[in-house]
Amino acid sequence: MDPYRNRPSSGFNTPFWTTNSGAPVWNNNSSLTVGSRGPILLEDYHLIEKLANFDRERIPERVVHARGASAKGFFEVTHDVSHLTCADFLRAPGVQTPVIVRFSTVIHERGSPETLRDPRGFAVKFYTREGNFDLVGNNFPVFFIRDGMKFPDVVHAFKPNPKSHLQENWRIFDFLSHVPESLHMLTFLLDDLGIPQDYRHMEGSGVNTYTLINKAGKVHYVKFHWKPTCGVKCLLENEAIKVGGSNHSHATQDLYDSISAGNYPEWKLYIQIMDPAHEDKFDFDPLDVTKTWPEDILPLQPVGRLVLNKNIDNFFAENEQLAFCPGIVVPGVSYSEDKLLQTRIFSYSDTQRHRLGPNYLQLPVNAPKCAHHNNHHEGFMNFMHRDEEVNYFPSRCDPARNAESFPVPSAICSGKREKCVIEKENNFKQPGERYRSWAPDRQERFLNRLVGGLSDPRITHELRTIWISYWIQCDKSLGQKLATRLNVKPSI
């Protein structure tokens, strides 16, 4: 009998209960005891196995993006981009690729309400013929920090106080006062966009700058953007309290119910393209993740559409065990020197190995749907059937060879080894422009949220003065209004 033929699956369920090893269980209601009221016997293997499995049901929670919901569907190319990339799944209009998508909140725990003011994750796994491609982004196009060295710190600042386990504004504004590049992100988080109505009415962004490479080896910087066909809708504070008070899983339920009813969510994928030769023409660094690219100069170009038409079959197997990593790319798509992207490439795969084990890419939801071959073997929870005698490379006894080469970025890097900030920080221009683009009532709501955060009694006069000086440099009127509301005299 082939032990690998019938892998564990509900498709092989028996009509009666069994142990994990397949032995029949004739009583799944009572423990084995000495007499009807006697002590339980240690030899009750089924009881021990049942309890031991129960005790180990929970796996480590994601350090960020713990609260999430997933759905499956397809991505279809609608516009020709073969002049920009040799990626097989983007080779021509009409090509469809199966996908799974996970939406999430970022900071709060696995069971937290989906109505909290928080960025939202928007991660897409493409199961292409050349391997998986993970586009791991958020609903906002920018982030709080530009260098991954600060990533643990920004997460710690937003997470609950380690002493009281309460999320506190003084900790957030204390840390962010040291990273003024965060101001642009705050104009998204404290804006009306800060609480999406649900996942279907939410934009997505790749956030980081990637590269596309065509067959000739020409490289372009690229930004990815998802636009929902049903529009963007958000909740104001009073609406969020009402919705969250009646259903703390409202966004998950909305996604699940919409797909079940045949009302399939859809997003259009757009890209912005920049020639690396032109990167010095801007007053910001195009690889700075705290900046957006101006759409009037670098317009959005349509690529395809994402349709989610199938709910997941099991929440644990296809949401909790679903794992993404920005390092998982395919030929025709690669990385840039974006400092945050460079650190995410390591951190994401490392946290998956911690949560799920070294063989997490063997889990069905994470495994590629195309043929694949390497000598990465053994380790905890390895369930791949292998019968090779050669587990090294190269070998004259094994016909496996290197794959055909494909174009990769080949820019020459030069410079001295140093730890430093980028030359073009320009932290205040874009947040100021964004604030001035809003209607007066929207500006007022943003100001109220800012005042509320900076009114935390543990925020010092010095800290408020720093924040006022920052916002004055973004927009003088905004900074002066903030100073008046906080009863603080501006220092500049």
Curated annotation (Swiss-Prot):
- Free-text tissue specificity from the UniProt record: Abundant in endosperms and cotyledons. Only in small amount in root.
GO annotation terms (biological process): hydrogen peroxide catabolic process; response to oxidative stress
Known cofactor(s): heme
The record's subcellular locations are: Cytoplasm, Cytosol; Peroxisome matrix
Instruction: Report the EC number(s), separated by commas if there are several.
Output: 1.11.1.6
Task: Please provide, alphabetically and separated by semicolons, the GO molecular function terms listed in this UniProt record.
Answer: catalase activity; heme binding; metal ion binding
Cite the Gene3D superfamilies for this sequence.
Answer: Catalase core domain
InterPro entries, per database record: Catalase, Catalase_AS, Catalase_clade1/3, Catalase_core, Catalase_haem_BS, Catalase_immune_responsive, Catalase_sf
Q: Where is it chiefly localized?
A: cytoplasm
Q: Which UniProt keywords apply?
A: Cytoplasm, Heme, Hydrogen peroxide, Iron, Metal-binding, Oxidoreductase, Peroxidase, Peroxisome
Record family assignment: Belongs to the catalase family.
Protein name (database record): Catalase isozyme 1
Provenance organism:
Ricinus communis
The organism's taxonomic lineage, starting at the top: Eukaryota, Viridiplantae, Streptophyta, Embryophyta, Tracheophyta
